[in-house]
């Protein structure tokens, strides 16, 4: 996913000149590239967790993503462009040492590129087995995954305006599910909420108390794997498993 944002002071001046309100969030936009029709996001399969035990194959995988980035970001902007790779539930289900090996190799690959990295990043290692490249490559928690999804959905739906109310977020991924929403004020318990503060162009704050919960192992792929295992256990592991829940082409 490639995106950019305007200088906040420039955008504020522009909106003032046009007589537009300033009590809005800064505008995010797709990064401009050689082609205005270049997609701002790309998805490839499989996920990072599939490289457990075969980290030598990560370079070719990551380079597919970097090829897309280079097609969108102008070459002269690469040194000012930070890059982050955030893995989700599939990686959370791996053993710590396996996660770390994948993250470190991923870090080696992107450090060869002319992107911007935090000046404090001196080597490939991170603070723990869930981070590398000083946090530019890491495995995010289920709560972070839910929070980021909630932020993205509400931003894209323009639900952060002064008169708007936010929407809830339910995400069933491949290996986990997340739920995030702002509860009613009388249901808010500060110990269970994430405090989100967004800064508008007029320097006012947009604050939200968000409840987030996550269920590792309850994504669509993980749930189906358990379902097939239960079928095989019940039927004695036959070569063909009768499954009334699938369409004919998948039986």
Tell what function each PLM region has.
Residues 222, 228-247:
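Non-catalytic, alpha-helical, charged scaffold/linker segments
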Residues 50, 89-93, 144-146, 174, ...:
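Solvent-exposed loop/turn segments at secondary-structure junctions
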Residues 1-19, 155, 162-193:
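Gly/Thr-rich phosphate-binding beta-strand-loop-beta motif of the actin/hexokinase/Hsp70
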Residues 71-79, 157-163, 168:
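Surface-exposed acidic, glycine-flexible loop patches that form ligand/cofactor-binding
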Residues 115-158, 174-177, 182:
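Active-site neighborhood for divalent-cation/phosphate handling
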Residues 82-88, 136-142, 168-171:
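Extended hydrophobic secondary-structure segments that form protein cores and membrane-embedded regions
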Residues 1-122, 191-193:
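Conserved phosphate-binding loops in N-terminal lobes of ATP-dependent enzymes
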Residues 249-251:
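Conserved small/polar residues in nucleotide/adenosyl-binding loops
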